[in-house]
């Protein structure tokens, strides 16, 4: 940004901002004078001291149009400089703009460039930070030129000398001092900033670059190359920014009237010596003000103190130099000056920071005023205060229309006062502004009439903090109300997340015509009915409204007038008003249009009208001909509000049904009709909730009589488990898990029974059941606690490791109706308190996640219609996901553009051709077509737009169900869509009161529907064993890992459900069996992984030694010994190693099979014991995370995925397809080898104690985990590539949101963020480009760099080429070809060349924090985190910010380049026929 000489900053239409290090000339050019004195204001007159830090001569007058001495007053003297006091007569606002400077007695190093990591000065001079510090702080001398004395003494340039060594050389070579400093024979050594300044000034950057590149190419030492690369990056940054004699002329800016720019704006790039300052800029005094307090004291900005310290020390140093003080004193003063300047620029970095006198806190330096939440970027530039706003408490406004809000008169008159005054004066009611104000203050009745007219058609914005997504600010048409609270429509509460328990909201008035238009068209609440995160309605009725609609549309048999037939809706309403039919009575009404019903009326007919009668026969024929419908009076009343296009809604409306209906209305009849419908059902809902008199009493909560029986059964089962444990057949861990399972099942059975009793009570009209079933309030979980039993309670724990003991195994048997005992109450307080504390702690985490998401995605804008990519994303139909309640196939493809034709493989029909948008109808059709197993869709992940993304790859805008428009800020919408539910994710445990739910380990797996069994990769053995009762039992045991059972539809052959069968499961069906629904398919041990014998033979222990690799634990209660494998490393010497394993040997003693046994395994066989296939040899306990309700696992998991962190205990993954074999054993690790058919072999070292999933000889595919643990996303990227890791991240994050919180987020939002995480590549070989190896650069920049050398060649031998062409130089191919033609013609030696090499790179997965800091925009990165580091790097490299994203434009005060702020709209010119002028009217 360029400041003109002396005038205010140019309000130029700049398109980019360049960052560079200020040269001493530019500092002086910006300055209006030197600050010589440390004083601020005179203690008596309170006027600024001349030449002080507040001087009027330098910074401008403190009063408008008045000089310091008072000689010139008034605006007529504008621009005159007073001859007495030297102050220019101008406005006092210049004190915010004009700068001064302090001329330093000695050069001082800028702390940012010295202390940054890596140190910029250190990199240029090849000095460590420690050594630099000693030079800068005057501890040692550094040799600048060794000269002849240096050569004789063996001293080289940059050697450090102590004081003694320095003086020894000086005394030895006395005549050296007589030589001129520029003489190469003179020995020169200095210390402090002056030495660094000289060294940097004498630096040859080009020579340094050549030298460092040579090291990179030729050095074999990895360390040397890494150091050289680090230095080369800094050298190259300076070289690129430093282009001598390149002047920025008028043509490029158009800002200056003269031919050339003023001298200070001629930019020649960064010179290294600019990092050492000879003058310091003094910022304008209004930015570091002195504020008078009462009692004659002043509050001052910390910067004034820091400046004062610099000036005092600088002045003292000047004096000491003048009086030729001894070197020791001078040196100390110079060091103190350096420290004072360091403190001024960055006080927080110093260990001994300068502190204030009173409160002993570190002073806020210039860096601190930029950094953090209170810094310039985030406090003043990203968040600005606004005028024309107010705030008040909100109350419900049930009579408002959806687009209205109630604004208190007292607020409205304040907000619209200027407009009211203008109208009063215009209409002649008031003579002047003053009298109009008086009328308003008196609250004259005429004022209210004028106010009504003023606000008519003027929307206001309502905002509730925290504004987590765009629906947190909406526009409303205000209606004036009495009182002091704002009235809010009940249906918009969901979007604002508002309730009426004291919430406050802010009101803002859009002033300009454009702002009002935007508010009315885009932000009006009746236009924002759909949630951008999922495309589902957000203005959904809740609580009383849902209950009222549910009550209204419910049917009851045996009511007054049941079976009556009506001709029209009017007749029904008349009959109901005359009480001839009841509200819930089943009746028949004539209707021939569209009907939405989910029951067969002919089945219900027999219950309503007696079969065999004439009426029954007639009604049956009418129903079959679809002339009549069977419905209730309430449904007729409800359908009065439903638009005719939707048809007759003939079902009970609960919350889910209402949401679906509103979604249909929105897409079929548009927003206007939907808003009208919403207002109508709001009225109906409230009215019938009141009319039904639905309230809860204690007698409505019915405890099932069978509860006692079930509890007895559970107590009996838990006693049996304890007996087994006492017999030694169970470990303590298994006992605990089984007891928890018993109580969990019992709790669920009791809950289900209490729910069924409620359902049957009063024919389904039990108020508690109605509230629950309609979705108005409460959940099954709460009913379980009220009427069943509270069940098991989670023990509050910090970690989410799922350790045994996370659930207290003694359940709370009582429910809340019966009341809890003291002990039960005490146990349950645990969870309830944890829930509340979690809420407050986790909200901050979610907020921080949202901020990082916004920062990483803020510059993703739709910039073009179609990027023309041929790539797409394959979406598969996943049976497991669909049946486990995750997002269905149709949801994933709806609203996307197809990359290829979607074809039904059975019929060969094309359902959706390539390049078309998949509509709702298409999506439903695809979901129901078994022949479509996959669809290739366009995706943000594969979009090839150079900047932003294209409309086709994004698909439809979810909030309007139309293709996304160019200019839509999809990045911010994505960040809001993920961040907003993130805050809900955190507030989860709270509502369950800490009860433990979920986590029942199912031992039996049953068929979800009937079908034919199909085995996939299943290997079994037959096994017979004697059970507890002494009876022999035969079973089929699965010995293959990851086998599957598919349940296939017998008719269509479509896979209905896929089950993964665990190792060691007992099969209860055979391949080809036809199974019924709920038939058991297999049973398995959920709490442990089993190691099972696969062949006959005898057990032989290998490396299983008592006290070394296993311990014998005798259970004190049972007396049985349990053998557990332990971590043996601590028991052995460093050279020894062990690998506990079980071997099966045959009669000859030959080993037939080996099984490694991991740490913590429990052995179930003895050495020498005979085994048959299917025998359990050992069990590895599995930790179960049973505290399903606690989200603590959810948010950190999402953060871990977005930050692309390597999991704490990652799985080892194979990089190639092949077969597994085990290699040698080391002390702390063992070898696993994977070898493929081509002879390629990879060796992996697995830590001892880690459970190996693969067995000897197993076939594995690249990317398969060999050991247990989470797979690292970095491994997926390395082995399977960017597409695989992108889909992995999207799917994993989706799982957390769906399973933990049931939150629906459309995939495209996650794709936008994940795309940003993979925008960078790391350069491997730079080829002949200007890139450096190891550089992290944008993918598009990498492609550009390669394109720049695509048409070029490298000269290998120059032949008789002109002198300007050298070997190894790059030239354009066509130039060389042309030149060679001429050389050949003249019989000269031609130029030999080879094609220029392009760079190579590999993709890099960055976490969102790193990605946000690595953004191309300097301003955006600086305002996010690590402000000083970002600015330092940008200044050194002379970076240019092209202002492409939203954040940087907000900061510089421009319109954001999204929506109507797009550049293409700014340059629009209307080209059309000039309108014919209207003929002038003739005088009558």
Swiss-Prot record:
Q: Per the record's keyword annotation, is Nucleotidyltransferase included, yes or no?
A: yes
Catalyzes what? Answer: RNA(n) + a ribonucleoside 5'-triphosphate = RNA(n+1) + diphosphate
Q: Which residues bind Mg(2+)?
A: 499, 501, 503
Q: Annotated Gene Ontology MF terms?
A: DNA binding; DNA-directed RNA polymerase activity; magnesium ion binding; zinc ion binding
Binding note for cofactor: Binds 1 Mg(2+) ion per subunit. Binds 2 Zn(2+) ions per subunit.
Q: Which residues bind Zn(2+) 2?
A: 867, 943, 950, 953
Per the record, its GO cellular-component terms are: DNA-directed RNA polymerase complex
Q: Which residues bind Zn(2+) 1?
A: 67, 69, 82, 85
GO BP terms in the entry: DNA-templated transcription
Keyword Magnesium attached? yes
Which cofactors are named for this entry?
Mg(2+); Zn(2+)
SUBUNIT field: The RNAP catalytic core consists of 2 alpha, 1 beta, 1 beta' and 1 omega subunit. When a sigma factor is associated with the core the holoenzyme is formed, which can initiate transcription.
Q: What does this protein do?
A: DNA-dependent RNA polymerase catalyzes the transcription of DNA into RNA using the four ribonucleoside triphosphates as substrates.
Protein name per its UniProtKB record? DNA-directed RNA polymerase subunit beta'
The scientific name of the source species is: Chlorobium phaeovibrioides (strain DSM 265 / 1930)
């Amino acid at each position: 940004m360029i400041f003109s000489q002396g005038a205010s900053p140019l309000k130029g239409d700049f398109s980019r901002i360049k960052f560079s290090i200020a040269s001493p000339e530019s500092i002086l050019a910006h300055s209006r004078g030197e600050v010589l004195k440390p004083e601020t204001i005179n203690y008596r007159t309170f006027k600024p001291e001349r030449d002080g830090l507040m001087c009027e001569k330098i910074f401008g007058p403190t009063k408008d149009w008045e000089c310091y001495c008072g000689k010139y007053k008034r605006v007529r003297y504008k621009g005159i400089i007073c001859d007495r006091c030297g102050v220019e007569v101008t406005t006092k606002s210049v004190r915010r703009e004009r700068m001064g400077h302090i001329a330093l007695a000695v050069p001082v190093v800028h702390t940012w460039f010295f202390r940054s990591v890596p140190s910029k000065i250190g990199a240029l001079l090849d000095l460590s930070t420690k050594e630099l510090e000693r030079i800068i702080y005057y501890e040692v001398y550094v040799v600048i030129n060794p000269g002849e004395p240096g050569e004789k003494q063996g001293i080289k340039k940059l050697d450090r000398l102590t004081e003694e060594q320095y003086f020894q050389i000086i005394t030895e070579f006395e005549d050296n001092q007589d030589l001129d400093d520029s003489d190469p024979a003179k020995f020169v050594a200095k210390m402090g900033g002056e030495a660094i300044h000289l060294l940097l000034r004498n630096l040859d950057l080009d020579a340094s670059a050549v030298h460092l590149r040579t090291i990179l190419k030729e050095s074999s030492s990895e360390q040397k190359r890494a150091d050289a690369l680090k230095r080369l990056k800094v050298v190259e940054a300076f070289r690129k920014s430093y282009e001598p004699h390149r002047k920025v002329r008028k043509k490029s800016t158009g800002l200056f009237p003269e031919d050339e720019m003023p001298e200070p704006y001629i930019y020649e790039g960064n010179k290294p010596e600019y990092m050492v300052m000879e003058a310091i800029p003094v910022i304008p005094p209004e930015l570091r003000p002195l504020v008078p307090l009462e009692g004659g004291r002043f509050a001052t900005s910390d910067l004034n103190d820091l400046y004062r310290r610099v000036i005092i020390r600088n002045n003292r140093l000047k004096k000491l130099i003048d009086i030729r003080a001894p070197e020791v004193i001078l040196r100390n003063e110079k060091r103190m000056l350096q420290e004072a300047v360091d403190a001024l620029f960055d006080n927080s970095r110093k260990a001994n920071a300068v502190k204030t006198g009173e409160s002993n806190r570190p002073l806020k330096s210039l860096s601190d005023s930029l950094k953090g939440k209170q810094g310039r970027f985030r406090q003043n530039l990203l968040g600005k205060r606004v005028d024309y706003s107010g705030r008040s408490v909100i109350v419900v406004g049930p009579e408002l229309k959806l687009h209205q809000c109630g604004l208190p008169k007292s607020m409205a008159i304040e907000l619209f006062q200027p407009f009211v005054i203008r109208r009063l004066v215009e209409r002649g009611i008031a003579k002047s502004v003053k009298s109009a104000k008086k009328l308003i203050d008196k609250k004259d009745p005429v004022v209210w009439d004028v106010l009504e007219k003023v606000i008519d058609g003027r929307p206001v914005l309502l905002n509730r903090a925290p504004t987590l997504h765009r629906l947190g600010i909406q526009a409303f048409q205000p209606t004036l109300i009495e009182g002091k609270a704002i009235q809010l429509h009940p249906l918009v509460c969901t979007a604002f997340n508002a309730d009426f328990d004291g919430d406050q909201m802010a009101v803002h008035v859009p002033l300009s015509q454009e702002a009002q238009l935007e508010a009315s068209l885009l932000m009006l609440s009746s236009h924002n009915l759909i949630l951008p995160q999922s495309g589902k309605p957000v203005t959904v009725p809740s609580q009383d409204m849902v209950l009222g609609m549910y009550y209204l549309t419910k049917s009851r048999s045996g009511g007054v007038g049941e079976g009556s037939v009506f001709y029209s809706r009017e007749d029904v309403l008349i009959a109901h008003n005359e009480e001839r039919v009841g509200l819930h009575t089943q009746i028949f009404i004539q209707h021939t249009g569209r009907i939405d019903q989910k029951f067969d009326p002919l089945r219900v007919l027999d219950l309503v009208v007696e079969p065999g009668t004439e009426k029954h026969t007639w009604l049956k024929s009418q129903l079959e001909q679809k002339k009549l419908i069977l419905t209730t009076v309430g449904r007729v009343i409800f359908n009065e509000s439903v638009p005719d296009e939707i048809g007759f809604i003939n079902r009970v409306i609960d919350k889910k049904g209402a949401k679906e209906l509103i979604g249909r209305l929105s897409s079929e009849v548009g927003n206007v009709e939907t808003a009208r419908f919403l207002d109508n059902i709001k009225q109906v809902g409230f009215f019938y909730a009141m009319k039904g008199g639905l309230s809860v009493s204690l007698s409505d909560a019915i405890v099932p009589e069978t509860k006692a029986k079930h509890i007895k059964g559970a107590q009996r089962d838990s006693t049996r488990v304890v007996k087994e444990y006492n017999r030694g057949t169970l470990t303590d861990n298994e006992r605990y898990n089984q007891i928890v399972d018993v109580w969990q099942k019992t709790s669920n059975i009791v809950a289900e029974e209490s729910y069924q009793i409620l359902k049957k009570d009063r024919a389904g009209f039990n108020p508690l059941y109605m509230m629950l079933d309609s979705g108005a309030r409460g959940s099954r979980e709460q009913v379980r606690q009220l009427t069943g039993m509270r069940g098991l309670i989670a023990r509050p724990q910090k970690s989410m490791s799922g350790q045994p003991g996370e659930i207290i195994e003694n359940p709370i048997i009582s429910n809340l109706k019966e009341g809890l005992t003291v002990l039960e109450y005490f146990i349950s307080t645990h969870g309830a308190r944890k829930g509340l504390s979690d809420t407050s702690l986790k909200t901050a985490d979610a907020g921080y996640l949202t901020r990082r998401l916004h920062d990483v995605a803020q510059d993703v804008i739709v910039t073009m219609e179609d990027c023309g990519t041929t790539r797409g994303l394959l979406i598969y139909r996943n049976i497991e996901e669909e049946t486990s309640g995750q997002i269905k196939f149709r949801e994933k493809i709806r609203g996307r553009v197809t990359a290829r034709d979607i074809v039904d493989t059975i019929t060969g029909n094309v359902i959706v051709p390539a390049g078309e948008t998949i509509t709702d109808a298409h999506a439903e059709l695809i979901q129901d077509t078994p022949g479509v197993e996959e669809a290739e869709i366009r995706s943000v992940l594969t979009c090839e737009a150079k900047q932003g993304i294209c409309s086709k790859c994004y698909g439809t805008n979810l909030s309007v169900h139309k293709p996304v428009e160019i200019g839509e800020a999809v990045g911010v919408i994505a960040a809001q869509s993920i961040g907003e539910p993130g805050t809900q994710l955190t507030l989860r445990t709270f509502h369950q009161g800490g009860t433990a739910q979920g986590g029942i380990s199912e031992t039996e797996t049953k068929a979800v529907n009937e079908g034919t069994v199909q085995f996939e990769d299943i290997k079994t053995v037959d096994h017979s064993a004697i059970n507890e009762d002494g009876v022999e039992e035969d079973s089929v045991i699965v010995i293959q890992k990851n086998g599957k059972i598919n349940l296939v539809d017998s008719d269509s052959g479509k896979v209905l459900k896929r089950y993964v069968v665990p190792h060691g499961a007992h099969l209860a069906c055979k391949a080809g069996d036809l199974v019924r629904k709920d038939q058991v398919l297999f049973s398995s041990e959920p709490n442990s992984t089993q190691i099972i014998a696969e062949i006959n033979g005898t057990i032989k222990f290998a490396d299983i030694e008592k006290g070394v690799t296993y311990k014998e634990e005798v259970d004190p209660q049972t007396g049985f010994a349990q053998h557990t494998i332990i971590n043996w490393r601590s028991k052995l010497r460093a050279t020894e190693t062990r690998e506990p394993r079980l071997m099966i040997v045959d009669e000859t003693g030959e080993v037939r099979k080996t099984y490694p046994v991991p740490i913590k395994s429990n052995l179930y066989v003895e050495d020498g014991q005979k085994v048959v296939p299917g025998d359990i040899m050992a069990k590895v306990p599995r930790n179960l995370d049973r505290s399903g309700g606690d989200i603590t696992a959810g948010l950190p998991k999402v953060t871990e995925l977005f930050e692309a962190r390597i999991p704490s205990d990652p799985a080892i993954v194979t990089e190639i397809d092949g077969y597994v074999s085990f290699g040698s054993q080391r002390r702390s690790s063992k070898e696993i080898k994977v070898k493929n058919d081509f002879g390629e072999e990879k060796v992996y070292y697995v830590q001892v104690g880690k459970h190996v999933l693969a067995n000897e000889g197993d076939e594995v595919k690249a990317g398969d985990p060999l050991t247990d643990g989470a797979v690292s996303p970095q491994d997926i990227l390395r082995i399977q590539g960017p597409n695989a890791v992108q889909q992995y991240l999207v799917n994993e994050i989706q799982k957390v949101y769906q399973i933990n919180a049931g939150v629906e987020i459309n995939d495209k939002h996650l794709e936008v963020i994940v795309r940003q995480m993979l925008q960078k590549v790391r350069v491997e070989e730079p080829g002949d480009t200007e890139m450096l190896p190891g550089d992290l650069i944008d993918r598009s920049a990498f492609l550009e760099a390669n394109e720049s050398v695509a048409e070029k060649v490298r000269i290998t031998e120059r032949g008789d080429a002109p002198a300007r062409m050298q070997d190894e130089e790059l030239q354009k191919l066509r130039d060389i070809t042309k030149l060679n033609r001429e050389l050949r013609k003249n019989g000269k030696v031609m130029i030999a060349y080879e094609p220029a090499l392009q760079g190579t790179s590999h993709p890099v997965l960055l976490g969102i924090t790193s990605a946000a800091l690595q953004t191309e925009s300097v301003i955006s990165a600086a305002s996010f985190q690590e402000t000083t580091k970002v600015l330092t790097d940008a200044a050194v490299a002379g970076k240019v910010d092209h202002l492409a994203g939203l954040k940087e434009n907000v900061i510089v005060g421009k319109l954001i380049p999204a929506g109507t702020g797009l550049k293409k709209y700014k340059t629009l010119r209307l080209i059309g026929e000039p309108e014919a002028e209207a003929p002038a009217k003739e005088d009558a």
